[in-house]
Amino acid sequence: MGSTSNSTKNTGSTTTTTTTAAPATTAKHSNSAPTRPSVHYYSSTGDIEKLSNLLNNSATSPDTPDSEKRTPLHHAAFCGSAACVNFLLDKKANANIKDSAGNTPLQWASSRGHLECIKLLVEKGGVDVNTKDDKNGTPLHKASLFASAECVLYLLNGKADPRAVTTNGETPLHHASAGGNPQCVELLIKADSKVNAVDNDCITPLHQASFSGHSSCVSLLLKKGAKVDPRDIHGISPLHNAASAGYVDCVEQLVRNGENINCVDIEGVTPLHHTCFNGNLQLTKRLIELGAKINMVDEMGETPLHKAAFNGHKEVCEYLLYLDPTMIDCRDSRQSTSLHLAAFNGLLDMVDLLIRYKAQINIKDEEGATPLHKASFNGHSSCAKLLVDKGAPICIVDSQGATPLHKAAFNGRSKCLATLIRSGAELEVKDSQGGTPLHNAAYNGHSDCCRILLKKGANVNAVDTHSSTPLHLASAAGARDTVDVLIQFKARIDAKNFAGKTPLVYAIKKNHSDVARVLIRAGADLDQVSLRSSVDFTKTFGTENHDEIYQIVNKRESSNHEVDELQLALEQQAKEDMEQLAAEKQKLLLIKAAIAQFNSHPKKGIEFIVANGVISEKNPKEVAHFLLTHSELSKQSIGEYIGEGDDFNLQVLHAFVDELNFFGLDFDVALRKYLLTFRLPGEAQKIDRMMEKFASQFYQHNPENKVFVNQDAVYVLAFSVIMLNTDAHNPNIKKKMTKAEFLRNNSGINSGDDLPPDFMENLYDKIVTNEIKMERDGNQANQHVEKKGWLTKQGGRIKTWKKRWFILTANCLLYYKTPQDHEPCGIIPLENVVVTIDPQKKFCFMLHSSQEQMKACKLNSDGTLVQANHAAYFIAAANMAEMDSWVQSIKSNIHSNPNFEQLLKRKAETIRGRGKVSTKPIQNRKQTISGPPPSTTTTTTSTASNNVTSVGSPPNSGSVLNSSGSKPVTFSSTSSPVQQQTSALS
């Protein structure tokens, strides 16, 4: 969704060619001793006297490298000390030596505009003006972005190539246009730099200047023959860039020079869509004055009004409706109106405005959901109350028979649930699967919602179409608190569904020992558990409470005379084996069970650990020690647990970090050590608590540090480094954060001052070149992975080859964009599949079925799972051995499963249960080159697995950025939770 996010690049590779990390000056404070060889320090400070004394009176070489392979000449060139540069050249310093990024001293001097140093290096040092760094960036690239016109002119006169391209295909003119220096632009064009040059993404210098808001450069480029309407690979024009970034002058110039005000990118997005999404009323008005059409729709059917309403831009919506009131009920491709979007996001003022403009309050989208369903699903009680007060029927149903109360109960929105009940919602209304709101709340373990419903009179023993009660669902889900509530309100302990199973059967089958105990103590009939479940009991209860198990076995032996001898022998052997277990082995088994319980439900796991004596008492220090000393524990579960805000969890977090030793560690080393102990949770507040404690511990352990004024600076920088790490090493992020952006993002964090530049630049280099490896446990669905690796897959409708991360697990082949992703792009069940090696394509095999289409599904661009349009899949490996290995593994997993349709439906319902909103995202352009900061904003995107900082990138329209990561999560208010409940009992 949303092609508009990638019009210009955030310098993934360009940055490393155009800017270089400043060499550390070593002495961060006047009283501190240099941490690097003093020859580098004296070179960087321009202290020619001490530098000459050192080199003349010692065996120190003028080419002595530091840890980044930078010599004194690099440092002197960067800091602009012509005297030191001249002296070092006299001492025969190598002027062509390169640092770890491939930069010569000339690149350093050029990036800072030190003309005298440039002249010395070229004329005295003999450096080639076209020398290239590791990304093919030349000194002219560096000077064009940051330096003065005099430096550019000197390099050009020295035969610097004005058409040189980086590995991203960018010329010096691209950089000068992004930097906004019209004199540099004119010099480069005069030197025959192509004014319409395109980089690897078809981005031109005009794209760069427009996005950065450099109207003088835009004017000059157009005057020199730049095409006014070039398109990048996403169909994005300079006008899109200027509009999304909010530059009126650039917009006006482009339109005056002939650009179509209603130009569209490959997804039908116009400049007006951008300004409305961003809430820029001034530019919205100007675009309309220039002829922009307010009723144009993108490929998702969304109008500018949809964009403005989704983000709550009230003034923009009022202006659009003033011009055309008939837009109020325009529907997008999913039949959603602006009121659906505003209600979904809980934008009370926007909902009120749209209702005042006569929006249809009961209008339904393609899933039969009304705005009230949307508001209820996300728990926006104020919006729900307003909609009801304005006439929305409280018991209106969607296409699956669900009312707004079903939605609130399913998603655990207790406040909204209470609001709907007070407004007259019916408690016993059933959806198409016979489920009541209480079924929904019980299925997802929302005990607070269950309590509210039961106190208001909901039938605790209501049955759905499968005759399952809420207690069946809660027991199968392992929701102990909910089970307690249901029993408290007199739920039938031994109710049987149509399968003849009681809640206890499901608790045992799912290994929910705590729930099983609650049911047994409440009087559950043990005879309802089949004899085969003795093994399940042992697995469920571990090795404790043997008497309970023996009672079950003995009772069954006396009452069931048809038990065969083998079963009796097995039970007797199991009993004898348990009696012979040594105490240590029992403890090991307990620990294993405790770990499994914790990995499934962290809080219940801790209760299990305490209740069964794994630790002596519920003491924060003991719990923290347990979490740190058992490697089998899920790092994700540890992160979720210690990140919770409850008092005890906070105490555990503090005890957990207190066990970690950061004494004498560099900042990045300490952070790496910390992040190896758990997996960062997705919720921002949890991360905040964890980083705050890390900052405190690191600062206390390093009282002699000369970098940080207080622990607040450590805290902010820790966040920033995590974002940088994700940005630098996530293959999905093509526009990487530059060093200049990293420094700019962290300016003033040290009690109002900047952290030392050499420290920050060195830190940037460490993170970019050496990824912080964060522990992860993998997707829950992929815990038993048979095979995984990179393969190349051919698309369905569009026959392109794309690299994907494949996982073979549970008779399914799943593929992801990256190994870090939580949700697969597609699922290929290996049911009745044939594997054939394709002799026409190298190392390629084909998956196909005797049916017309394979029973596979893929993740749509809006986050929903849909039927894939594949008669066959073509997949290529890197070599013959790898292909043979995959083919053999896949063949061994092919099976026949008549229930696949139900499985696919279950997965689709689950995805929709997370929700889907019908609007298409717009993301602002990302600046290609880091230069003097244009008036952009920095948006932080957090992901379950990743945190990303991008320049000028707003949240997606139509999606909600998840707190973990890098990918937007969309929501639907019209899932079928009871269908999910049914499959949960299978």
From Swiss-Prot:
Record-linked InterPro entries: Ankyrin_rpt (IPR002110), Ankyrin_rpt-contain_sf (IPR036770), PH-like_dom_sf (IPR011993), PH_domain (IPR001849), Sec7_C_sf (IPR023394), Sec7_dom (IPR000904), Sec7_dom_sf (IPR035999)
Low complexity bias locations: 1-28, 936-953, 963-986
Disulfide bonds: none
SMART domains linked: ANK, PH, Sec7
ANK repeat feature ranges: 34-63, 68-97, 101-131, 135-164, 168-197, 201-230, 234-263, 267-296, 300-329, 334-363, 367-396, 400-429, 433-462, 466-495, 499-528
Domain SEC7: residue ranges: 580-770
GO molecular function: guanyl-nucleotide exchange factor activity
Keyword Repeat: yes
Region ranges (Disordered): 1-43, 911-986
Keywords assigned: ANK repeat, Repeat
Gene Ontology CC: one annotated term: cytosol
The keyword Repeat appears for this protein: yes
Protein name, UniProt field: Ankyrin repeat, PH and SEC7 domain containing protein secG
Native source organism of the sequence: Dictyostelium discoideum (Social amoeba)
Phylogenetic placement of the source organism: Eukaryota, Amoebozoa, Evosea, Eumycetozoa, Dictyostelia
